[in-house]
Amino acid sequence: MANKIWGSNNEPLKIQFITDTHYYSRKGGTEGKAYDKAESKSQKVIKDSDLVIKAGFDMLCEDKSTDIVVLAGDTTRDGEIESHKEFIEMLRDLKKRGKRVYVITATHDFRDGGVADGYDGDKKIEVPAVENRHDLWDMYYEFGPNEAISTHPESMSYVVQLAPGYRLFALNDDTNYKPEGERGSGFSDDCMKWIMEQLEDAKKNDQFVIAMTHHPMIAPSPFYAIIGKGDMQKNHETTREIFADAGLSCMLTGHTHIHDISYVVTDKGNTFYDIACGAMIGCPPTMRNVTIDPKNKKIDVDTIMIKDVPGLDTNQKPFDEYMKGFFFGMIGEIVWAMGNDIDRLAEMTDAFSIPGEKVKKLAWLIKPIGKWLNKLTFKKVWRLCKKESGLKKADIADIADNKVVDFILELVQNLYCGDSPYGPDTREYKLTCGLLNVIDSFLNTIHLNIGKFLKG
């Protein structure tokens, strides 16, 4: 039986939601061959992140209908100390302009070993980075934890009273999942116990709960569920069921840089929503307006697109269109390099957390697959997965000779930008899912987790 909605007499509350700002201090170096090489394989703006974030913050401040801003992690590029210092000053300025700011940190905000990449001419150098993630709690204490009505210091999670009848659960899932010495995203047993206690307290006090965490709890597409398993929160299927059945129905997430809203319904009939937002400095460069209206049993979500960035040369294009060409040009080059230039591929895969050295070691496998993929047509795909797709030859006659690579590039663009022209009923969707299921079944048969294997 579905839960009663808590805070059902509340007036609507609007929240501005941002994530994955990935601020980079120019003090780390922005010129020379080493920097140019890093920028060429990045899926996000690096040296001009300050300009983009300032433009985004200006847009937030133009909206006087709410004073609440929440940020779901990855505040910096790679945890550089100078990046943190400068970004914190930007957040302080945001508060001075009338915003209440609530932050959690995440994967890119610290570095084991305490160093990150910087650039000096032709050389990549080391720059100081935050080494102990718990130092981030003190660094960002003025952005949420200082207002907390309850905290879980080990995970760096906290609860704040946003407004009468509304509580924000800021749940830091980074390296929080620790069974038998493992370390990964998710929630430890002790953290889950604390969360459930806080949900029970919210229920007793008739408080509507809105939550944020960094890693996704619902895959933004069936394709991502297969290729991006390693980027999902650990135990996300179980955890989201527990949350939904305990009255937590809406989670704001980041990490993927994908603009998406997905939901699942539990066995008990409770709905859980994962509202993901793109990175401000990526593609798409978005922010969200989230308006919660428990009285009318709805949550409205609007997209804010960053289109104008003063001081940034975008070749006279709106910033979002500029980033689309930048990012998807890189995706096309990656697909081409798979079959033609392994060294170039190895340089670019770091942007997707796949070590270049691992790519080079697998060149014997990747290159023939890449050549095959670049020549692959839907007719050939259909022959491989007739049964899985449920399609007949006549069903695909008009797309039989279309190249799958062109469709993949469009699919990735749709995935990141939040468009869904290829729904479950389309031939392209059925063929692609059929092929991925064939590949996934084969990998499971030989006990190979491709995501874990590639990321080492």
What name fits each language-model region?
Residues M1-I81:
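N-terminal active-site segment of His-dependent metallophosphoesterases
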Residues M1-L13, G311-G456:
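Non-catalytic terminal accessory segments
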Residues I5-G7, I81, E86-K193, K268, ...:
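Extended active-site neighborhood of metal-dependent phosphoesterases/phosphodiesterases
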Residues P12-R26, G165-N176, M212, Y273-G278, ...:
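Active-site-proximal beta-strand elements of phosphoester/diester hydrolases
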Residues D20, V69, D74, F87, ...:
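Divalent metal-coordination and catalytic microenvironments
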Residues Y24-K27, R77-G79, T107-V115, N176-P179, ...:
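Active-site environment of divalent metal-dependent phosphoester hydrolases
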Residues V52-G56, H152-Y158, I195-E197, N235-T238:
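Alpha-helical scaffolding within the catalytic cores
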Residues E62-I68, R100, R167-F169, G181-Y273, ...:
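His/acidic metal-ligating clusters that form di-metal
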